[in-house]
């Protein structure tokens, strides 16, 4: 990042461009975050937010270069990726998310990349941050599983 402005990797999660943008992200952080924090601990939740926030913003920056973007959507996708991976081989739901929610988020991601959301007035969307968040959440989930198995 230009001139060693490393903080730009995390500060976009504090910027939102509309009240609905903030409300949508806050809702998912509350719903998913409270479940992850309760079941997996506060330290893991905070680490997950920081990891997915930095990763999603870095991917967005790599893909689009210097541009103005913000929001917690990359982190939200990271939380979904984490929950999905942790639940993948469990016999029962851990976080209580119905499969339709995961499908909805994937469809939303695809619609974003296709430009359909912008056509319907959702504004410019940091699609690569969403994808980066999803991938980094999956990675965090894999690392969490590996670490948990080694320490049992």
Regions found by a protein language model. Name each.
Residues 1-152:
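A detector for small-residue-rich transmembrane helices and their helix-helix packing motifs
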């Amino acid at each position: 990042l230009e001139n060693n402005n490393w903080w730009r990797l995390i500060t976009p999660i504090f910027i939102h461009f509309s009240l609905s943008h903030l409300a949508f992200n806050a809702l998912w952080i509350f719903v998913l975050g409270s479940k992850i924090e309760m079941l997996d601990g506060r330290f893991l939740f905070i680490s997950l937010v920081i990891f997915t926030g930095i990763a999603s913003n870095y991917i967005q920056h790599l893909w689009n270069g210097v541009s103005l973007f913000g929001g917690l959507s990359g982190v939200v996708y990271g939380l979904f990726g984490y929950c999905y991976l942790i639940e993948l081989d469990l016999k029962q739901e851990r976080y209580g998310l119905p499969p339709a929610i995961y499908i909805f988020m994937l469809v939303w991601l695809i619609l974003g990349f296709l430009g359909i959301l912008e056509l319907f007035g959702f504004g410019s969307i940091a699609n690569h941050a969403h994808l980066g968040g999803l991938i980094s959440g999956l990675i965090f989930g894999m690392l969490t599983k590996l670490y948990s198995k080694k320490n049992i």
